[in-house]
Every structure is written in C-alpha cells, then in structure tokens.
From Swiss-Prot:
PANTHER family: DEFENSIN-LIKE PROTEIN (PTHR33147:SF27), DEFENSIN-LIKE PROTEIN 1 (PTHR33147)
Lineage: Eukaryota, Viridiplantae, Streptophyta, Embryophyta, Tracheophyta
An annotated GO cellular component: extracellular region
Entry protein name: Defensin-like protein
Source organism: Petunia integrifolia (Violet-flowered petunia)
Alphabetical list of PROSITE patterns matching this protein: GAMMA_THIONIN (PS00940)
Principal subcellular localization: secreted
Matching InterPro entries: Defensin_plant (IPR008176), Scorpion_toxin-like (IPR003614), Scorpion_toxin-like_sf (IPR036574)
Cellular location(s): Secreted
C-alpha cells in the first residue's frame, strides 16, 4: 500500500512538472506604457503610422490615434 502511494505521488509530481512547462515560458513583467499628446502633430489623426512617425521624431517609441476627437498620443515606456 505504501509503495503504491509513493509511486502515485511520484507520477503525479512528474505529470504536474510536464504540464506546467506546456503552459508556456515564464515571461518577465512588461514595462508600463505612458502616453502624452503629441506637440508636433496637427489636425485630425487618421493614420496611426503617420502619428507614430511624428512621435518618433519627438523621441517616443510610437503613437496611436485616440479619443473621440482623434488626437495623436505618443507612447513610451515609463
């Protein structure tokens, strides 16, 4: 009886280790993203690629068209 419990516990532990690696690799925590309205982008923001290009000239990593008024918001890691 004791041997079967030990065998079951060993099998269960190996199965849990195998299943935990199937869930994907551990990833590091992502940095928070801060946003600021672009100072150089003028007019209605229609194309996000245009907004991102302007934001990169301002030193940000990218940009998105946001809000009801379609303004260009630049993004960077905090």
């Amino acid at each position: 009886m004791g041997r079967s419990i030990r065998l079951f516990a060993t099998f269960f532990l190996i199965a849990m280790l195998f299943l935990s690696t199937e869930m994907g690799p551990m990833t590091s925590a992502e940095a928070r993203t801060c946003e600021s309205q672009s100072h150089r982008f003028h007019g209605t923001c229609v194309r996000e690629s245009n907004c991102a290009s302007v934001c990169q000239t301002e030193g940000f990593i990218g940009g998105n068209c946001r809000a009801f008024r379609r303004r260009c918001f630049c993004t960077r890691n905090c």
